[in-house]
Each structure stands twice: as C-alpha cells, then as structure tokens.
C-alpha cells in the first residue's frame, strides 16, 4: 500500500512484472485487501489492469475452479460471498489495441503484466512507457535470474535497451521481498527430513551458485547426505553414484529474447504473454 500511495501521489503508474499463473492472482488478492480495508483513502478508486492474455485466462480458471485454486483463508472469504481476486476498478486487456490504450490513459494506475522477468511479453512495452518517468514505479514481486532485464533493473541499471531504443531508468525500482513460489531453506530442510528412505545423493539444481552451494553444505551437515550443487554440464552416473564429466565453470552470457529470429520471437512472446 505504501508503494502504491507514494507512486500515485507523484502522479505515476505502478508497473508490476508478474508471472501469469499464480503470482498475478496473488497480487490481485493483496490489492483487493488494500481496497477493501481502505488503506489508500486518498486514492480509493484506482484502476488495476491485467495486461496478459495468459494471465487473464489463468484468472478465469481460478474463478471457475474455486475449490482447487484457493487456500483456506480465501475459501472463508468465498463462503462469505467475497471473491478474493476480484474488486471494483479491475480491468483486463486481451487484444493488442486494449494493451496500447493503457498507456494513453494518463491517470495513475496499477499495471500487472508478463513476463515476470521482463524478457518478453507486453511488460516490455509498459517498461518503455514508464521507465523514463521519475513519477512511476516498477515493483518486482518474484525472483530475477541473472542475465535478465528484470535482474539488471533490480541491480541498478541506469539505461536499458527496449525495442532498439535506449531508455534511461528514472522510475523507482522496488523489490517486494518474502513473496516466492518456492519453499525456503527451512521448508526444504523439513521436507528432506521427512523422507523415509535416505537418498544416496542430493543434487541442488536451482538457485544462484553461492546459495546452492551453501544449501548443499547445509544438507550434508544436517543429514549426512552426499549433497552437491553441480555446474551446468556436470554428469553423474546415478547407478555408481560417481561423477563422470565436468561441465563448464564459465558464466555463459544470456542471449536476450529480442535477438531471436522474427518467427521464434513471436512464438516466444505468445508463450510468456
């Protein structure tokens, strides 16, 4: 609520790069609470746009499969006749024309769009229209992989290239910690401890290098398991439990989505929209 209030007070837009399935709906849940509890009395009727065809479809799936998609807290709201991810001022953009019109509207608003790491999809258009604005804010609500545009912005990039144009970053860049679709260290430790048949080998294959190696050491110290965080290309024989090949230890520079051929990029954009 503080981020929204500060942005709207400046007269800017709040742009939220979010994964279409799960994270977008989670943001809608939080924003509904902000509106319902009147946490922004100075901006009570602000509009929220979902600008992602996949996110719109996923949200419809949530509406149509209530018992499968919501937790106990949300089900209590539903039992009371409250839709946990729907509220006054919620708008959706499906067509490209609807998407373009969002940026013609000068009123301060919240824009939720994909992809969550800003590598493709309509979010890149909204970044182009808002990054140069000192009154706007980009709020990251998910992990940003090194090499992605989202990672660059979150780590202080002063200029970025979008659609062949260099954009100066003047908007406020904010990270919302504590929101993750993954289990944390304690939850993973608890899960490993519940395994009845002790694994012969544990591979830590997700996360940044230092974090993965630290967790592998934690697993070994806690359970005595043979744990390792392999590099890309490392090969292990799962029968003999031996390492048979070393992968690359060099950091591979990530190729941006806009470097793809036209047809490949079109397909990629549709998948992450």
Describe the predicted segments one by one.
Residues 1-273:
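Acidic/His-rich, metal-assisted hydrolase cores and their charged scaffolds
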């Amino acid at each position: 609520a503080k981020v929204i209030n500060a942005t709207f007070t400046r007269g800017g837009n709040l742009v939220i790069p979010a994964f279409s399935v799960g994270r977008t709906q989670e943001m809608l849940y939080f924003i509904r609470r902000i509106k319902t509890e009147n946490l922004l009395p100075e901006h009570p009727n602000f509009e929220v746009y979902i600008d992602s065809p996949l996110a719109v479809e996923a949200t419809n799936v949530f509406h149509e499969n209530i018992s499968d998609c919501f937790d106990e807290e949300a089900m209590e709201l539903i039992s009371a006749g409250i839709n946990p991810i729907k509220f006054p001022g919620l708008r959706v953009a499906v067509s490209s024309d609807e998407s373009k019109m969002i940026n013609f509207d000068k009123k301060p608003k919240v824009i939720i769009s994909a992809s969550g790491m800003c590598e493709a999809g309509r979010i890149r258009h909204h970044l182009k229209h808002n990054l140069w604005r000192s009154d706007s804010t980009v709020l990251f609500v998910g992990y940003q992989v090194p090499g992605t545009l989202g990672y660059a912005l979150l780590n202080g990039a002063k200029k970025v290239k979008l659609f062949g144009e260099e954009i100066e970053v003047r908007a406020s860049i904010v990270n919302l910690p504590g929101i993750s679709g993954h289990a944390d260290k304690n939850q993973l430790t608890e899960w490993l401890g519940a395994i009845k048949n002790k694994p012969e080998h544990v591979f830590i294959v997700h996360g940044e290098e230092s974090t993965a190696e630290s967790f592998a050491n934690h697993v070994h110290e806690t359970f005595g398991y043979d744990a390792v965080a392999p590099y890309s290309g490392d090969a292990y024989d799962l029968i003999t439990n031996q390492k048979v090949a070393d992968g690359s230890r060099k950091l591979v520079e990530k190729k941006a989505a806009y470097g793809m051929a036209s047809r490949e990029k079109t397909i990629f954009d549709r998948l992450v929209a």
